[in-house]
């Protein structure tokens, strides 16, 4: 079920991308209030309140720069992925200690989450080359979006085993909550990249 939600989130981001202005072309002086800029940017995401709550405290750093906006979102996304991975890893350790049949399912999920972290880090690294426009910049931006899309897919894959296998209800609840929150964050990051960076 969560995998369907993740795929739906990805589709929504790209379908709705044509409905929002490409802010990269907007002169920096257009937004005098940096907090307002962040709020406006977050309104282009699927979960605007979550987006604003995450990014508003960084508005003085982001200012009115779409690249700083997306880079900040990506860095926070990496942090969220690490936190979600920690939740699943702790459950895995408990399952191992109890010699539970859930071990293999949780291990697969942790592996997917590690891939998610790596992909988001790759996106952060690639963002360093997204500046100035032109064909090369466009290619780097495409790579960033690909890494983030892959991360979103892996987050959904993480929970596949919980749908197919026998898992403790409480364990499933904790994992789904952690991954669901992460998927929303990643969806927002992808939306910001899609709506606010275009060359």
Swiss-Prot record:
CDD domains: PMEI-like_3
GO molecular function, one term: pectinesterase inhibitor activity
Listed GO biological process terms: regulation of root development
Tissue-specific expression: Expressed in outer cell layer of roots, particularly in the root-hair zone. Expressed in roots and siliques.
Disulphides: 42-51, 109-158
A family per Pfam: PMEI
Keyword match DNA-binding: no
Keyword entries, A-Z: Apoplast, Disulfide bond, Glycoprotein, Secreted, Signal
Signal peptide: 1-25
InterPro entries per the UniProt record, alphabetical: Invertase/methylesterase_inhib (IPR035513), Pectinesterase_inhib_dom (IPR006501), PME_Inhibitor (IPR051955)
Main subcellular location: secreted
One of the record's GO cellular component terms: apoplast
Domain of life (superkingdom): Eukaryota
Glycosylation: residue positions: 16, 33, 43, 83
Annotated function: Pectin methylesterase (PME) inhibitor that can target the root-expressed PME17 and PME3 in a pH-dependent manner, mainly in slightly acidic conditions (pH 6.3 and 5.0) but not at pH 7.5; this processus relies on changes in the protonation of amino acids involved in intermolecular and intramolecular interactions. Regulate de-methylesterification of pectins in roots and affects root growth.
Homology family: Belongs to the PMEI family.
NCBIfam families, per the entry: PME_inhib
Annotated protein name in UniProt: Pectinesterase inhibitor 4
Record organism: Arabidopsis thaliana (Mouse-ear cress)
Encoding gene (name): PMEI4
């Amino acid at each position: 079920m969560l995998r369907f939600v993740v795929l739906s989130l990805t589709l929504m981001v790209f379908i709705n991308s044509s409905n929002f202005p490409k802010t990269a072309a907007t002169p920096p002086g257009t937004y005098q209030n940096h907090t307002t800029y962040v709020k406006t940017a977050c309104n282009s995401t699927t979960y605007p309140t979550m987006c604003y709550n995450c990014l508003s405290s960084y508005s003085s750093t982001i200012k009115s720069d779409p690249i700083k906006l997306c880079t900040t979102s990506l860095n926070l996304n990496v942090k969220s992925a690490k936190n979600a991975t920690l939740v699943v890893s702790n459950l895995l350790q408990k399952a191992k200690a109890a010699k539970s049949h859930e071990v293999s399912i949780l291990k697969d999920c942790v592996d997917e989450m590690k891939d998610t972290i790596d992909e988001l880090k790759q996106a952060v690294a690639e963002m360093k080359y997204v500046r100035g426009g032109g064909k090369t910049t466009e290619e780097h931006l495409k790579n960033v979006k690909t890494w983030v899309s892959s991360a979103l897919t892996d987050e959904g894959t993480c929970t596949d085993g919980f749908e197919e296998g026998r898992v403790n209800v409480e364990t499933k609840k904790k994992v789904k909550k952690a991954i669901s929150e992460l998927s929303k964050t990643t969806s927002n990051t992808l939306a910001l990249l899609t709506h606010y960076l275009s060359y």
